Design a protein with these regions (language model features):
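Short helix-loop-beta junction
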Residues: 46-50, 340, 380-394
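Peripheral docking tails and interdomain loops at the edges
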Residues: 421-501
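Flexible inter-domain linker/hinge segments
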Residues: 1-6, 226, 230-233, 243-245, ...
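Thiamine diphosphate
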Residues: 1-137, 143, 160, 179-180, ...
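Conformationally flexible catalytic loops at phosphate/diphosphate-handling active centers
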Residues: 60, 173-357
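Redox- and metal-dependent alpha/beta enzyme cores, enriched for Fe-S-associated oxidoreductases
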Residues: 355-390, 403-410
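A general structural motif
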Residues: 125-129, 337-353, 370-378, 397-404
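Conserved thiamine diphosphate
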Residues: 127-179, 191, 200-226, 457-468
Length: 501
């Protein structure tokens, strides 16, 4: 495939790959250092402080506050001013410390915001700064759309896709990768070109057609003609009656053309009907009134020149209505935005992305499902076992939330056994996989869950805990996980831990 943007070949680690994308697209970053994501903000700030500009020629800002809670709160405030992509980078306890701000970030529908995460275990009986999925799982309940890469290549590409999805869906995105195993692992990578990012994302201060009816109602339901008529109504006492009628008649007769006249080409035809002292205002009204059904790519939720309050108190009559609207009209639209962004990015780069990646699954009888860097290891082991005649496969989840039920069920339909690899003892991925499969079984007796393939029975399920705090995972441990599905098929196992009787 001759892709338009095949990428710039380099050797880079995950933190560097993400930071480079941020440097190209962000208008600002507010972050606080915490291992293993510290380098993301450091590399970004080194680029910015050296005079670096994003692909739209804007010199971005960076601010380091006194802690992770303030970093997320500040990033939220910056993102609400609109017109720019904004990020924070964090991990582990830093995410938990700022968790209340993460809930607010999602609840306010702050489009264009992306949280960059180098996933790290949350310290429990002892401190550990290595890989684990506890922090990412902690974000699930806040409502972020969550993408998860397996290597620096995917970390960079999914970073670009994250900004697109966040801006179009208005639901903030977490772009996650494994701490150290990806964030610090040097790898051959095809970095996204600046021209690709400019074309793929679009100017965050530019205008787009509202992609859903809910967004149009929120941002663009009235439009230019309505606003111009409102202006005339406020100043009608200043008009000659004949001129007032002529101005109103012109707007009525040319409503469609006026609505689309973003450059103000028609305004000159109307100036003769306006008192001289109003002509400058009228021209500004015309140019600053936006076309009906459009919005800024990254909307402004506050005006820094006219600040106001967002998120006032809502009690019994209203709060549930806001939550219902959030899920029904915004969150439910996210999967389609993700699929469209991944398809467009794949077309531009030749690097294929889908919510669920499958490897040798078509005729597989036993399959492992995982998140992050372990799936690359599992694919290598799978290839080896195939040479031994084993019908095995690997499913790598790229979209963790909203969980891609339909794609997951399609990938696992007809399999004898499935092992879910969990880099956390919370087992949230196991829960998501199991729920998706149960929906497929329910659909066998009639479509109760639209879009999800019907399956007659469930595969034997195993949860395999591995790599907590970067506990060593050897190829032989993954071989054992596949063999478990062929033999005793224990429902819960640890990989790499030895038990003594």
């Amino acid at each position: 495939m001759n892709a338009k943007y095949p990428g710039i070949s380099t050797v880079i680690h995950g933190n560097g790959a993400v930071a480079e994308v941020m440097g190209h697209v962000c208008g600002g970053v507010i972050g606080y250092p915490i291992t293993p994501s510290t380098e993301i903000s450091e590399i970004y700030e080194a680029f910015r402080s050296g005079g670096g500009c994003n692909v739209w020629g804007k010199h971005p800002f960076f601010f380091e506050p006194e802690g992770e809670h303030s970093a997320q709160s500040g990033a939220l405030g910056a993102a609400m001013t609109g017109g720019k992509f904004v990020s924070n980078a964090s991990s582990s306890q830093g995410i938990l410390y700022a968790l209340e701000s993460h809930y607010v970030t999602v609840g306010k529908k702050v489009g264009g915001f992306v949280l960059q995460v180098a996933a790290r275990v949350v310290s429990k009986h002892s401190l550990n700064v290595m890989a684990g999925h506890d922090d990412v799982y902690a974000l699930l309940q806040s409502g972020y759309t969550i993408l998860f890469g397996s290597n620096p290549q995917e970390a960079a590409d999914l970073a670009a896709i994250s900004y697109k999805v966040s801006a179009t869906s208005l639901i903030p995105v977490t772009n996650a990768m494994d701490g150290f195993a990806t964030s610090h692992m040097m790898c051959e990578t095809l970095m996204p070109e600046p021209a690709l990012l400019r074309e793929f994302l679009g100017d965050p201060s530019g205008r787009i057609k509202c992609p859903t009816m809910a967004q149009e109602m929120l941002f663009g339901a009235k439009g230019r003609v309505f606003q111009l008529k409102q202006y005339i109504a406020r100043h009608q006492a200043d008009f000659d009656p004949a001129d007032l009628l002529a101005a109103k008649s012109f707007l009525d007769a040319n409503a469609d053309a006026v609505e689309k006249d973003n450059q103000g080409e028609l305004v000159a035809k109307t100036l003769g009907w306006f008192p001289e002292e109003l002509r400058g205002q009228w021209r500004r009204q015309w140019l600053n009134a936006f076309e009906k059904g459009t919005r800024q790519l990254v909307p402004a939720l506050v005006d820094i020149n006219n600040p106001g309050v967002t998120g006032g108190v809502q009690n019994q009559p209203d709060f549930q209505a806001g939550s219902v609207d959030h899920r029904t009209h915004f969150v439910n639209a996210v999967p389609q935005f993700v699929r469209e962004a991944m398809a467009e990015y794949s077309q531009l780069t030749g690097r294929e992305y889908k919510p669920v990646k499958t490897f040798m699954c078509d005729d597989a009888e036993t399959v492992v499902v995982g998140l992050g860097s372990v799936t690359d290891d599992a694919e290598a082991v799978c290839s080896y076992l195939r040479t031994q005649g084993k019908k095995v496969g690997v499913v790598s989840i790229k979209l963790l939330q909203p969980f891609p039920d339909a794609e997951l069920v399609a990938a696992l339909a007809g399999k004898k056994a499935v092992t879910v690899l969990e880099r956390s003892d919370v087992t949230a991925l196991t829960t998501a996989v199991t729920q998706a499969l149960f929906k497929g079984v329910e659909n066998a007796s009639g479509e109760r869950h639209p879009g999800i393939p019907a399956i007659k029975s469930l595969p034997k399920m195993t949860t395999a805990i591995f790599g907590l705090g970067a506990h060593d995972l050897q190829p032989r441990h993954l071989v054992a996980a596949f063999r478990n599905m062929e033999t005793r098929n224990a429902p819960f196992v640890y990989l790499g831990s030895q038990f003594f009787s």
